[in-house]
Swiss-Prot record:
Function description: Not known; weak suppressor of a mutant of the subunit AC40 of DNA dependent RNA polymerase I and III.
PTM statement from Swiss-Prot or TrEMBL: Pyrophosphorylated by 5-diphosphoinositol pentakisphosphate (5-IP7). Serine pyrophosphorylation is achieved by Mg(2+)-dependent, but enzyme independent transfer of a beta-phosphate from a inositol pyrophosphate to a pre-phosphorylated serine residue.
Sites of Phosphoserine modification: 133, 293, 394
Domain of life: Eukaryota
Pfam families in UniProt: SRP40_C (PF05022)
Organism: Saccharomyces cerevisiae (strain ATCC 204508 / S288c) (Baker's yeast)
Gene name for this UniProt entry: SRP40
Comp. bias intervals (Basic and acidic residues): 1-25, 125-148, 283-297, 325-335
Name of this protein: Suppressor protein SRP40
Something else known: Present with 12900 molecules/cell in log phase SD medium.
Entry keyword set: Phosphoprotein
Residue segments, region Disordered: 1-335
Amino acid sequence: MASKKIKVDEVPKLSVKEKEIEEKSSSSSSSSSSSSSSSSSSSSSSSSSGESSSSSSSSSSSSSSDSSDSSDSESSSSSSSSSSSSSSSSDSESSSESDSSSSGSSSSSSSSSDESSSESESEDETKKRARESDNEDAKETKKAKTEPESSSSSESSSSGSSSSSESESGSESDSDSSSSSSSSSDSESDSESDSQSSSSSSSSDSSSDSDSSSSDSSSDSDSSSSSSSSSSDSDSDSDSSSDSDSSGSSDSSSSSDSSSDESTSSDSSDSDSDSDSGSSSELETKEATADESKAEETPASSNESTPSASSSSSANKLNIPAGTDEIKEGQRKHFSRVDRSKINFEAWELTDNTYKGAAGTWGEKANEKLGRVRGKDFTKNKNKMKRGSYRGGSITLESGSYKFQD
């Protein structure tokens, strides 16, 4: 904890390139936890937004961003990234961008590291807020479906953590897929360094870790997943100067669809923005129907194949009884764990359990030939010859022709 706060104090002293590198690294650590669940990251981000607002309020452009309508964009709609409590000033082509980006970079690096530090503390609180936010989100989705999107309909699919929001108003914010919260949007603004630093400030200061892609068109459609978790965050009072209500309503300055985006994205783990949520649900339904149709086809085909197999096998099956052990006089009953009367063989090959030698029956064939040539008791007579007890005739090919003479 202490080490991270020291890093926050050191950030403003770094050069511009080092700031960008450290912003990405710090924001990626916070975004990894945010992608897991927007509800879990919500409480931590709300607490961090209070910290980030205090740091950015001293910055030069904090006055414009505190009103949370500060996102100066070409399109007339107010951006949903207005939830970024302090210098969110989403990248626009206006001239005020350079000031807000320089001030935002200092606040973003501090607040993003604060978010990662505060997330460990607020894990216990997240479970309670997740339930409340789910209830609120369900209500907000119904409202959002009736409300049209703002004038600049930015087509953006904020999938998972990375929200690559491409707006139609001539500005593309390509957010980094690795760091969702620091979506460094490269826009048509004056300088890329300004856009990255300002986008990072908007992402870190927004009261949500998840995707606050500061789209240049400032349309509400996608920072949607960012405003999504911010509304669920707003249960805990954010000290930021933005208009986000602590009562749980979405960012007041953000236009109509931000509240609806919150419900969908937070429920689906930051995956789909409002514009994509309908299509994604349709895809899910199509997949479900396809799976069901496959499931219906497979049992039908299997049922067709199994009767044919069973019929063919039943035709070939033979019920050959194993028989019973015949006990001769003077014999004891052989111990057996198997009751032969209950056993049936399905083929005649199974009834033969005679052992064929490992040498491919060559030993058995040789033994048969020797038995034919030298007699039935060849081995026994051979051993007698070794002992000298054999009394036979001259050795010929006829059986029993061996004889040793003293």
